[in-house]
Amino acid sequence: MAGLPGALPLLTAEEEASLARTIEAGVAATAVLAGHRLRVDATRAELERIAAEGEQARERFLLSNLRLVAFVTNGTAGRDPVVSRQEVFQEGVAAMAGVLRSYDWRRGRFSTIAVPTIRRRVIEYVASRGGMLGVPAHRAVLIRRARSIAARLESE
């Protein structure tokens, strides 16, 4: 993750909204191309172009927010010897992509909405991979904290 290869510069609020609108248009165009009955006054070629632009906007949006995922996952990655930093980062990226699918740019900045979801998914992932299957994520975090404190007290 050093330097985050492929990461693009952060988006301004205006760029974020513009990309989100392009993504929405691309999703709608893809739905029409897939046979959903929506009334549009566009040719197949125009719909294909709009769908491609939507996919490019989605990719740019995700790449521009990789630093957000790195920021959120840095607090969790590396604490558990069972789960690697790369695994935690990948889970964070998957969570970010999920948030983007339901993101409504009219309701605020992406980071405000995405950070809690990414953090929750990463914590749940680490808890489930750290040998605590079946334990709720918040309880796994508490157990981990208690074990860490107990180990520190024993070493003193």
Where are these regions (language model features)?
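Alpha-helical promoter-recognition and RNA polymerase-docking modules of transcription initiation factors
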Residues: 1-134, 138-152
